[in-house]
A protein has these predicted regions:
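Extracellular interaction modules
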Residues: 1-5
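Active-site pocket-lining segments that scaffold enzyme catalytic pockets across diverse folds
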Residues: 231
């Protein structure tokens, strides 16, 4: 190490405690992820625009690229996704071919569901079968349909649960956020505390108790693997 690097290293503070204990004593935990993909995209764009300049063409701006390009979806539907960020593993390629995505929402949903929890519960297969009309299902309630329509009745994002809590059970935005935090912590006891107010609130809005219990069971299972949409 250089002397400057050594000085920085000496000033670093470490702890032997895990993340949960650190949060309990009031310290903030951040996760920082480095993505080489962003550098690859930057370099690729630079080379493309250098070539376009030679051909006297306008430079490409990533912000201007359409999200509904039919030729791009044709490549995706064939599983030609080698070197495409988050879509390049053998397993997800198989699901892309089955899904045959034709809109950006499909891609986001597949990436969100392609994780151990949803895979173990066959959520990807359920989404694919419902998208192509091969599996019959019922939303059971207009408010549920309004929120889960784009994902064919499958709970995919924490924001959907917050909306369900508000629309179906009458939660305030603050109460819905408490439910979101309980999901984020993935602590079963905290989720259990949310069950009674969710069902009681639904009954007060004239919803069927058994249906409300079934919906909360789905939310509880989702809490074991769910993330927010931006993640």
């Amino acid at each position: 190490r250089s002397s400057a690097a050594s000085d920085v290293y000496k000033r670093q503070v470490s702890t032997q405690y895990d993340m949960k204990d650190i949060e309990l004593v009031g310290l903030q935990k951040f996760d920082f992820l480095g993505l080489k993909t962003l550098t690859i995209m930057k370099n690729a764009l630079k080379l493309i625009n250098q070539n376009r300049q030679t051909l006297k063409l306008d430079p490409i701006n990533l912000d201007d690229l359409p999200l509904d390009d039919s030729k791009t979806y044709q490549l995706l539907q064939k599983g030609l996704t080698t070197a495409v960020f988050q879509l390049e593993s053998r397993g997800i390629k198989e699901y892309i071919v089955k899904l045959k995505p034709n809109n950006f929402e499909d891609i986001i949903t597949l990436i969100a569901l392609y994780r151990p929890g949803p895979l173990e519960m066959n959520m990807v297969e359920t989404y694919i079968e419902r998208k192509h009309g091969r599996e019959e299902f019922s939303y059971g309630d207009e408010s549920v349909e309004k929120i889960l329509d784009k994902t064919h009745g499958v709970i995919v994002y924490q924001e959907q649960v917050m909306q369900l809590a508000q629309e179906f059970s009458g939660f305030t935005l603050g109460e819905a956020d408490i439910l979101r935090r309980a999901m984020g912590k993935k602590i079963a006891s905290e989720m259990e505390e949310q069950k009674e107010p969710f069902i009681t609130g639904a009954i007060e809005k004239g919803k069927n108790k058994r249906f409300a219990e079934g919906l909360f069971d789905q939310i509880e299972k989702f809490a074991g693997y769910g993330f927010n949409r931006s993640h």
